[in-house]
């Protein structure tokens, strides 16, 4: 297997595009095969160096509207379908957003995104409020601005772009085949339609998914290739943090090597992208640093939407100790 990984890596470094059959061989490396996974991480890092350079990208998010979501995503604390005791509030005011954005900027983080619960932007009034917030952030900070507001259309994407947004975040979450098992109130196609509208509007796209939803290894491979087919260059990979009260609240955590192996696989499939640590990476325990020396070159840092996240200074130390620049 080590010989296969080396030969495949050498081919990718020469411009070869990996196929699904080869990816299945990688994803099926046993999680307790430490030596082979170490080799995989080493070659994943070589691919990152050649195609994505040595600069790491840091982003941070703020929960701009919480709870009462109409959608039934089985992993989500903010769905109104489940009793999770999540804090609920309407869209927050600009002063609170600006205060958080300035904290993020002072920490040396590159990107900042407001994230709101709900199927999408729920009214023209909400859109106008968001535009005022982003226009203000564009004026009052030097941050690169991102947005994450669910399913939107082309016109809404254009308005957000005009207000100062450069990137929109919209995950596929899992493979097309498995999507109906985690959400029934909208479809995988709905998500892809939003992604296409975002791209047509000229916004950069941040699109990844969640590992540990009960999917098969095959679904992780399928998701990687589906994301590659969408032309994505920023791929946030979350690890399920089971939330009590949701249908997936008792799901077992993925073991660290399964997570690291999957992130390395995404580097093999999409060599020139930002592979981004996102929520739930606490499941890696003391192996978090291995991702940064195994192909990961971006991170969502600080707190997440409804869970405690990572320490910014610790993330910076891990990144620089892995040979990446911030």
Describe the residue ranges of each PLM region.
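Auxiliary Fe-S-binding modules of radical SAM enzymes
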Residues: 1-32, 228-326
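Core AdoMet radical
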Residues: 81-100, 104-195, 204-208, 233-238
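Catalytic cores of alpha/beta
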Residues: 153-161, 214-226, 282-294
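Conserved strand-turn element in the central/C-terminal portion of the radical SAM core barrel
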Residues: 112, 119-122, 194-218, 237-252, ...
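N-terminal pre-triad scaffold of radical SAM enzymes
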Residues: 39-82, 89-113
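Conserved, mostly hydrophobic/aromatic
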Residues: 15, 44, 73, 170, ...
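Flexible, acidic/Gly-rich N-terminal and inter-domain linker regions that tether
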Residues: 1-71
